[in-house]
Curated annotation (Swiss-Prot):
One Pfam family hit: TatC
Transmembrane stretches, start-end: 49-69, 103-123, 136-156, 187-207, 221-241, 242-262
Keyword check for Transmembrane helix: yes
Record region (Disordered): 1-29
Protein name: Sec-independent protein translocase protein TatC
Alphabetically ordered keywords of this record: Cell membrane, Membrane, Protein transport, Translocation, Transmembrane, Transmembrane helix, Transport
Subcellular location: Cell membrane
Membrane disposition: Multi-pass membrane protein
Described function: Part of the twin-arginine translocation (Tat) system that transports large folded proteins containing a characteristic twin-arginine motif in their signal peptide across membranes. Together with TatB, TatC is part of a receptor directly interacting with Tat signal peptides.
InterPro entries: TatC
Organism: Xylanimonas cellulosilytica (strain DSM 15894 / JCM 12276 / CECT 5975 / KCTC 9989 / LMG 20990 / NBRC 107835 / XIL07)
UniProt family annotation: Belongs to the TatC family.
Annotated PANTHER family: SEC-INDEPENDENT PROTEIN TRANSLOCASE PROTEIN TATC, SEC-INDEPENDENT PROTEIN TRANSLOCASE PROTEIN TATC, CHLOROPLASTIC-RELATED
A Gene Ontology term for the protein's cellular component: TAT protein transport complex
């Protein structure tokens, strides 16, 4: 006699995958809050370590860097035959200036390092598409910021020369070291941020916050603001310098507008069949 087993006929046909199922494609498994905080602490320590190393390098290179920073003052003094020099007004001002220059150089030099740490902390929670966008933003923002900083260095001697021209003949000008270095740092940051602003507009467009129609309607205001920014940052009597500063900013704005037009039209074509 053949004995029949009591095993259901379809017991092995559909295995239970609930316990072994992983995260959905393109997503990462959720990390507990404690692990997030531990990862954040690690990244912050790495950023702080990089800034300390950069500050030490800035401290050691302070003397040649100060010569480079004060070169526009010496050029203005030589061309206008005036007595123009850097002045330290307080007893601790030389030390404060050295610390400020060292920290500023540390932030600039270690920019790739701390940006990578931010990226390493954020990227595990991003989807594949978001990672591609982030790669594009970083790949565009860093060179644009450095380009803006380089343009500010070209503008700086012209600005110093214009300000020095207002010194009366036979007078001397002793420029406060703290104020002068703060002016240089603000100039570098202002140009860097101005060049990165179009990347932020593209990010807002990709996020669905701003459409290309809005950017197209505001192009006149964008051009006006670019020329106002150039006029304020380059107080020179000739219009050529102002145009040379404003033209790249305008070109970047229209480049961002072109990317927004391409993205919106592509998104509209993708959603049109679903709406129909």
């Amino acid at each position: 006699m053949v004995s029949l087993t009591s095993v259901p006929p379809y017991a092995d046909a559909t295995p239970d995958t609930r316990a072994s199922s992983g995260p959905a494609p393109g997503r990462r498994k959720r990390m507990p809050l404690r692990e997030h905080l531990a990862e954040l602490r690690t990244r912050l320590l790495l950023v702080a370590g990089g800034l300390v190393v950069g500050a030490v390098v800035g401290w050691l290179l302070y003397d040649p860097l100060l010569v480079l920073l004060t070169r526009p003052l010496h050029l203005a003094a030589a061309t206008q035959h005036k007595d123009i020099a850097l002045n330290f007004t307080a007893l601790g001002s030389p030390l404060d200036t050295r610390i400020k220059v060292s920290l500023f150089l540390a932030v600039m030099v270690t920019c790739p390092w701390w940006l990578y740490q931010v990226w390493a902390f954020v990227t595990p929670g991003l989807t594949r598409r978001e990672k591609r966008h982030a790669y594009g933003f970083l790949g565009a923002a860093v060179p644009l910021f450095l380009g803006g900083a380089g343009l500010s260095w070209w503008v700086l001697p012209h600005a110093v020369d214009i300000f020095a021209s207002f010194v009366p003949a036979g007078s001397s000008q002793y420029v406060n070291a703290q104020e002068y270095l703060s002016f240089v740092m603000r100039l570098v940051l202002a140009f860097g941020v101005a060049f990165v602003a179009p990347v932020l507009l593209v990010a807002l467009n990709l996020a669905g916050i701003v459409r290309h129609e809005t950017l197209a309607r505001g192009w006149r205001w964008a051009v006006l603001l670019a020329f106002v920014f150039a006029a304020v940052m380059t107080p020179t009597p000739d219009a050529l310098t102002m145009v040379l500063v404003a033209a790249p900013i305008c070109a970047l704005y229209f480049g961002a507008l072109g990317v927004a037009v391409w993205h919106d039209r592509r998104a509209d074509r993708r959603t049109a069949p679903a709406a129909a």
